[in-house]
Amino acid sequence: MRFKKTISIALALGLLLLSLMAFQMFQKTQLVMFDSISFNMPLESFEKVFGKPNEIVEETETGYHNPWRSKDPYLYKTGRLFYDYENFKWKGYSGRVTFTFSKSHRLQGAAVYFPVTSKAQQKEIFYQMIQDMKAEIEALPDYQSMTTDTVGLYDDGYRYKVKLKGQMIELWIDVYPTEYEDDDNPDNNQYNIRIDQSRLE
């Protein structure tokens, strides 16, 4: 009897833990820079708030009819979607944003690209944008604390790992410069500041 009681208690605790994990997975976490938009938001609800995108891209991956020999490749749709919006504005900056939706069509993350005209302007705006981002993070209603790591090809960007009250899953925000330089034709050079948002799951 005592053994059965112990098993019952263990099963009950296991179910409670699974319920808490599921709650954490689907608990609303607001995205920084976007009012009324949260992670795990259903696609239909998202469109009502943010509107129709300029472009929708369906993710595809390569599969093989004979996976043992990687022969007869074919493309298949994974179910994930990318919603692209042009003319996104934030604190006087203009750019574009791509939202990523999971196979179940729930919001997974966002990537924002702010173009700049030169590397000098990129450096100037980047450090101002960092200050703006810190202020935005600390203004979150459930903000608790934040740690910072370096990211980017040359460790010239920052990753903010944000702890939120009542949640075990961290909010990660990466802010870093990106560049494409054409040695043959400098007029094709492209400089951006990119901001990624995701939840560590």
Where would I find each of the regions flagged by the language model?
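N-terminal Sec-pathway targeting helices
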Residues: M1-L13
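Short beta-strand segments that buttress and anchor functional surface loops
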Residues: L81-K89, V112, Y160-L164
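Short amphipathic beta-strand and strand-loop transition segments with alternating hydrophobic
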Residues: P67-D72, T98, T147-D149, W172-D184
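Long, charged/polar, surface-exposed segments that mediate recognition or autoinhibition
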Residues: E86-D155
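Bacterial Sec-dependent signal peptides at the C-terminal "C-region" and cleavage site
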Residues: G14-T29
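N-terminal leader/targeting segments
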Residues: F26-K103
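An acidic-aromatic pocket/loop used at catalytic or ligand-binding sites
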Residues: D156-E201
